[in-house]
Each structure stands twice: as C-alpha cells, then as structure tokens.
From Swiss-Prot:
The keyword rRNA-binding applies. Part of the ribosomal stalk of the 50S ribosomal subunit. Interacts with L10 and the large rRNA to form the base of the stalk. L10 forms an elongated spine to which L12 dimers bind in a sequential fashion forming a multimeric L10(L12)X complex. This is Large ribosomal subunit protein uL11. It comes from Cytophaga hutchinsonii (strain ATCC 33406 / DSM 1761 / CIP 103989 / NBRC 15051 / NCIMB 9469 / D465). InterPro entries: Ribosomal_uL11 (IPR000911), Ribosomal_uL11_bac-typ (IPR006519), Ribosomal_uL11_C (IPR020783), Ribosomal_uL11_C_sf (IPR036769), Ribosomal_uL11_CS (IPR020785), Ribosomal_uL11_N (IPR020784), Ribosomal_uL11_N_sf (IPR036796). HAMAP family: Ribosomal_uL11. One of its GO terms (molecular function) is structural constituent of ribosome. Belongs to the universal ribosomal protein uL11 family. Keywords: Methylation, Ribonucleoprotein, Ribosomal protein, RNA-binding, rRNA-binding.
C-alpha cells in the first residue's frame, strides 16, 4: 500500500547550500520533517550545481517521511545569465536591459524541456521567449520556424 500524502512544500534553494536556517528550516519544521536529513540529501544530490538556484518540490507523508524532486533552474535566471544582466527591467515594455538570440533561447528551452508542459521544442522556445520579453530583454533575429 502506498504512503498517504499530507502535503507538499515548494522551495527555491541554491544547489549544495541547503541549511536549517530560513527559509528551509521553518518550512520543513512546520510539517514535522527532519530538517537535517533533508539538507544532507539535497546537498548530496545537488553538489554538481553549486550556487545555482534550484526549485525543489518536497512531498510530505503521514509518517513524517518525505521525497523530493529537484527541478531545472528558473528560465528567468538562465536568461539573465545568457544576457549577462543582474536582473530584469522594472518596466519591460519601455526600458530594455539586454538582448538574447534564438540560439540562446533554444539552449535554455532544451534545458527546461523536462519541466515545461510542451511537447515540441518550438513551443518551449516560445515560452522562454515570452519570459525574456517580460524581463525587458529583446529577442534578436528571426524565429527559426518563420522561414
């Protein structure tokens, strides 16, 4: 028989840097989980991605055990790295802060593909391009499917 789920916890933690201080400690402590056990497992699983902000979905069971899934970094962070900017524009429609091309968008879309609800790479590229525009980045060049 499968374990009964009591809830989920979503967090964004830097790879290899989980520790019991906020935000990790209070979020897991309120569910009654062993915080140090999570930190050890998370750090071991993400030691190859140090300093990269990673979303994690923790499934909490009635016996206070847990499973977690580490997802790919947010598209906004990958776009900021590609455009070499610190953060997006406060007014994305007026003030442009950088530029990305379709090759960079394809690379990011391929990285994000497991976490996106898209079947085709073109659909994933459109999602990433939309995120780029909402950050105040211009998408240079012509889309590959608009020949």
């Amino acid at each position: 028989m499968a374990k009964e789920i009591t809830g989920y916890v979503k967090l964004q933690i830097k790879g290899g840097a989980a520790n019991p201080s906020p935000p990790v400690g209070p979020a897991l402590g309120s569910k009654g989980l062993n915080i140090m056990e999570f930190c050890k497992q998370f750090n071991a699983r993400t030691q190859d991605k140090p300093g990269v902000l990673l979303p994690v979905l923790i499934t909490v069971y009635t016996d206070k055990s847990f499973d977690f899934v580490v997802k790919t970094p947010p598209a906004a962070i990958l776009l900021a790295e590609a455009a070499k900017i610190k953060k997006g524009s406060a007014e994305p429609n007026r003030v442009k802060v950088g530029s990305v091309n379709w090759d960079q968008i394809r690379t990011i879309a391929e990285t994000k593909m497991p976490d996106l609800n898209a079947f085709k790479i073109e659909s994933a590229m459109k999602m990433v391009a939309g995120t780029a525009r909402s950050m105040g980045l211009t998408v240079s060049g012509k889309a590959p499917w608009e020949n």
